[in-house]
């Protein structure tokens, strides 16, 4: 038993793994007894392996790049794998967001799926929106695959899945080898995300829908409060009321409303042969209509309303008949979703019908053909300011779009702000010149027009200007 620091005289009993021949007294040498948090078992505890080992590298001769001109733009971010290859097996998943080390110097990132029609001698196809002539393994300013980071603990610059991100297989010689697949997320991970309605989406919908969902949220909170008040143990009641109050404070900041029936997050996968008006979504009824919403959400013009077609043969072949949390759409639909790509982007899927009316509008003319990576990418480092605070900048432009929408800005103005938001969201990841976008899209003038104000002392301010965008801002409360 290990003595409890905060409870003198009490102890916690633990199991200690030790080599054969260890004396009983040595298991009480607590300074040398460590937890197994950095290890993982693949066989129910019979053996343990490090939770992370440096990734195995794939020979680039095994892969092919499908460039934009060859159709790569329609599947940008997708990694197609030959089925049945042991070191490229996705385990129990039909799809996963992965990283694969190549030649020890570069890596590919994106959504991995199986393809049963790969050319002979090719085990992997990487789809890109970059043009022919871009080297597969070039320098950091001119390459399809990304250079690895100089960090033995995190060569991909983003952490892989904590448990199960790496796996092992038995090769033809009977030896255990590390798989080439490093998962960030896999089938089943996206559907478990929170399904509340964000104020970013709800504030741009008709008032009856807003009232309905907020009233449901209020009713849920009232029921929770009544349940706590019915408790008879004063100590438990006090703790529960404090937790309830904290939750209410947080809810007032984040402004999330009750979910609509059957709405769920799903990861998007490309099906180029899918019609512009259809979606492959086996978690929904064939023939019903659904709305797709991607965050950050600019407005109704980013909401495609699609008919579920679960009989589409290509989709069944790629995604399977029973995916846990994926839908299939074509590239045109993805472009309407504020320029989504297929490297792990997600959408909120909302079934529509007589009881759920989602307001949607045609895509903005000012967004047609706009590709932020082509317009603002590819510049040599050192010639522009590199984005380092995506969350902050994204918050600013999201608030601007919300305020402009609520205050009645015209479509041309909103298109400028949305174009800039599309640049900002990918600026850090794809090294885009977001400052030039800020100039080209007149962001300073838009902020002045739609967010500029004077306080009671005559001082000029810019920033969040409506209740929705100001909800997360701090304010000073006068003493009473």
Residues covered by each model-derived region:
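Core mixed alpha/beta domains of very large multi-subunit molecular machines
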Residues: 2-350, 354-367, 461-480
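C-terminal catalytic or substrate-handling cores of phosphate/nucleotide-
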Residues: 344, 354-480
């Amino acid at each position: 038993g290990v003595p409890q620091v905060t409870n003198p005289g009490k102890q916690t009993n633990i199991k200690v793994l030790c080599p054969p021949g260890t004396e009983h007294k040595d298991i009480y040498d607590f300074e040398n007894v460590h937890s197994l948090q950095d290890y993982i078992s693949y066989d129910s505890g019979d053996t343990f392996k490090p939770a992370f080992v440096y990734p195995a590298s794939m020979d680039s001769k095994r892969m092919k790049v499908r460039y934009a001109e060859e159709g790569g733009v329609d599947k940008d971010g997708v990694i197609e794998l030959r089925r049945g290859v042991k070191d490229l097996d996705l385990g129990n998943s039909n799809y996963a967001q992965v990283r694969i080390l190549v030649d020890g110097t570069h890596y590919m990132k994106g959504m991995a799926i199986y393809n049963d029609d790969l050319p002979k001698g090719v085990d992997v196809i990487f789809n890109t929106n970059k043009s022919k002539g871009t080297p597969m393994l070039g320098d950091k300013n001119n390459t399809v695959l990304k250079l690895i980071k100089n960090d033995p603990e995190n060569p991909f610059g983003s952490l892989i899945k904590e448990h199960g991100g790496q796996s092992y297989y038995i090769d033809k010689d009977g030896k255990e080898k590390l798989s080439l697949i490093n998962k960030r997320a896999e089938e089943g991970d996206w559907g478990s995300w929170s399904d509340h309605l964000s104020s970013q989406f709800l504030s741009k919908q008709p008032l009856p829908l807003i009232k309905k969902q907020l009233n449901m949220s209020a009713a849920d909170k009232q029921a929770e409060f009544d349940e706590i008040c019915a408790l008879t143990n004063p100590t438990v009641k006090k703790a529960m009321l404090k937790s309830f109050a904290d939750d209410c404070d947080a809810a007032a900041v984040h402004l999330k409303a009750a979910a609509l029936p059957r709405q769920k997050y799903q990861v998007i996968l490309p099906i180029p042969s899918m019609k512009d008006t259809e979606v492959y979504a086996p978690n929904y009824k064939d023939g019903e209509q659904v709305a797709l919403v991607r965050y950050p959400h600019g407005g109704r013009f980013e909401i495609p309303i699609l008919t579920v077609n679960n009989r589409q043969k290509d989709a069944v072949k790629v995604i399977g008949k029973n995916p846990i949390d994926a839908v299939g759409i074509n590239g045109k639909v993805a472009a309407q979703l504020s320029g989504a790509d297929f490297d792990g982007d997600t959408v909120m899927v909302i079934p529509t019908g007589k009881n759920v009316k989602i307001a949607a509008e045609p895509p903005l003319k000012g967004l047609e053909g706009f590709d932020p990576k082509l317009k603002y990418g590819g510049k040599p480092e050192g010639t522009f300011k590199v984005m380092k605070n995506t969350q902050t900048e994204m918050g600013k432009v999201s608030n601007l779009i919300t305020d402009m929408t609520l205050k009645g800005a015209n479509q041309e103005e909103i298109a400028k702000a949305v174009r800039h938001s599309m640049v900002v969201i990918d600026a850090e990841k794809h090294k885009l010149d977001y400052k030039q976008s800020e100039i080209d899209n007149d962001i300073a003038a838009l902020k002045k027009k739609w967010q500029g104000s004077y306080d009671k002392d005559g001082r000029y301010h810019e920033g969040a200007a409506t209740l929705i965008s100001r909800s997360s801002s701090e304010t000073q409360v006068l003493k009473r």
